Amino acid sequence: MDTSRRAVESYWRSRMIDAVTSDEDKVAPVYKLEEICDLLRSSHVSIVKEFSEFILKRLDNKSPIVKQKALRLIKYAVGKSGSEFRREMQRNSVAVRNLFHYKGHPDPLKGDALNKAVRETAHETISAIFSEENGTKPAAPESINRRIEGFGNTNFQVPSNDNKSFLSEVVGIGSASIKQGISNFAQGHLPKKNENGSSSYRGPNLHRSLTMENENFSRYDPVKLGKDGNYGTSKNTTGGSWGHASGEASESSASVRVESKTREEKLLETIVTSGGVRLQPTRDALHVFILEAAKMDAVALSIALDGKLHSPMWQVRMKALCVLEAILRKKEDENFSIVHTYFSENLDAIQRCAESPQSSLREKANKVLSLLNGGQSSGLMSSSDNTVKREAAVDLPDLIDTGDSDDTLNNLNAIDTGSTVATAGPLMDDDWFGDSSDIGLSSSEKKTDDDPFADVSFHPNEEKESADDLFSGMTVGEKSAAVGGNHVPDLFDMFGSTAKLEAEPKDAKNINDLMGSFSIDENNSNQKGSSSSTLPQDLFAMPSTTSHQAPENPVGGILGSQNPGFIQNTMLPGGVMPFNFPQGMMMNPAFASQPLNYAAMASLLAQQQQYLGNMSNFQQFGNLNAQGSGNVLSMGTSGGNQSALPDIFQPNFGNQAPTSTMNGSKKEDTRAFDFISDHLTSARDTKRVS
């Protein structure tokens, strides 16, 4: 019975080991490891040996995953299962040592990674098995004051938290000897460094900022060359001044900064860090910083800010610039005015930030430089050492070259002084037939495209060439030898004045003399020695003296006498047409349309009756026209007064279509015209009978 119970218990213990070291790529749960440790710690020695055998058998498994889990179980249980299990593992440590050079089959997916994990875990297990018992006792309950620690490298060295004296907190007092003594005292409590000068690995300290670049000696500190060849930045604030110092003083002050940080540096580290989501500090954080900084030493705060501006991390420099900008905006304060003066004399760090490839850092640095320069944005051009040469402005070529000079003032001066153009200007676009007469023009007569009325002249005496003179320079016939030197030919004026043409020889033929050979008066054309040319202005003009004065009548001069030289044709109206002659009226109306006046109409009817009574007196004119049927202009050749009425009895003219009078209204037939027709018929019949 006892044997069966022991067998069941043994099987149950083996199942516990198999569950922790299963061939699955999963980490064994910690609570199962704790159950095994509790069982080993409270069991008999025989049961502990049985557990050890089960675990060592799992080391012989072919799977590298099982081997690694068995080694991890041994490593974990050695420190928590008591001394009996440790002694058993020490007796059988050969099985663990054989896995130092384990080389199994490479995994198709992970390759040799699993085999390498077995080798590394074997080394760690041997180290845990043969470690001192005092260091491997079960962990006592942790005190509340102990800080939280995580897993990491075993070579991690916690930086010692040295107690700082009161003198290390004092800033701005004492002499250089006191500070040198403080630095020597601080050096004695520093952890020892390697003799070769390289510092050992120091992990992050959770009590301080993760971005403190001055925690070790290998921090970034750019070298600055002074005028005297010395280098380094002066951190000595004893005399209240700043400037360049020697390299030894820089190193000693750097050692003081490493050991004992001032209140200003501590305050600055609370806001100037590289961590965090925000690139710039919040407004509330800056407000709290300004309130605290107003109570501190401005010189030490300036030096601390200058150190942050030399940080290798651009995030730290960005936040330092934000803090400096907030301080500069409060420069009315006496304490912050010292910071303004300090950075006005030390612009190197800010100008280096202005040259950063980070756009946000560059913009912030330029803004700080503008505040330092009194609100004027200087950027990179503020320092003589970092001046950037501006590229010379390249004049673009004139793509639309009109030939005009860009210097309009010179053109105006040339016009005022009356200077002449030495060379011929380009021909205007409208001057197709331009000649060489334009070369002699002065600059005062120069045309410009800006003045559309430059060529318009309201004085007939000015001799100025028109811009639209398409026929300037064209001559028809021979040129006169007496042409003026600079006379510009005018447009062809058919109806204009020809005073100049009368002075030409009589045999000259001119384009202006189109009507020269036409004659209206037959006698004038047959006289000897008479000129064969008629001036254009006299073509339709009235003569100065007439042998017969036409009486005035309200009909518009239709019944009046016609002037000599006028074409005697019934298609043209007689006399002078009134000013209100309508546009749609025909050329041969009985009288022109006028506003209706009934008094005048009564007199007109009386004149018509008189006109019809005198019709019989004109029979002889009809006989004369019948004899000279081929001559239209036969009347009035004797030089006397011509007939005042149209030749209505001319038989050679075709019948005229009835004309419209009074604005197109059709004239009604009357008995008076029927009487005229009957009278003419009877007169012709009488002539035939006789």
Swiss-Prot record:
Transmembrane segments: none annotated. PROSITE patterns: VHS. Expressed in inflorescence stems, stigmas, roots, roots meristems, embryos, and floral and leaf vasculatures, but absent from the floral abscission zone. Residues 243-257 have a biased composition (Low complexity). It is found in: Golgi apparatus, trans-Golgi network; Cytoplasmic vesicle, Clathrin-coated vesicle. The lineage of its organism: Eukaryota, Viridiplantae, Streptophyta, Embryophyta, Tracheophyta. Binds to clathrin heavy chain. Residues 520-536 have a biased composition (Polar residues). Keywords: Cytoplasmic vesicle, Golgi apparatus. One of its GO terms (molecular function) is clathrin binding. GO terms for biological process: clathrin-coated vesicle cargo loading. This is Protein MODIFIED TRANSPORT TO THE VACUOLE 1. One of its GO terms (cellular component) is trans-Golgi network. Disruption phenotype: Abnormal vacuolar trafficking of soluble cargo proteins, and premature termination of the shoot apical meristem and of floral meristems. Plant missing both AGD5 and MTV1 are severely dwarfed, develop short siliques, exhibit abscission defect, and have altered subcellular distribution of clathrin-coated vesicle (CCV) cargo exported from the trans-Golgi network (TGN).
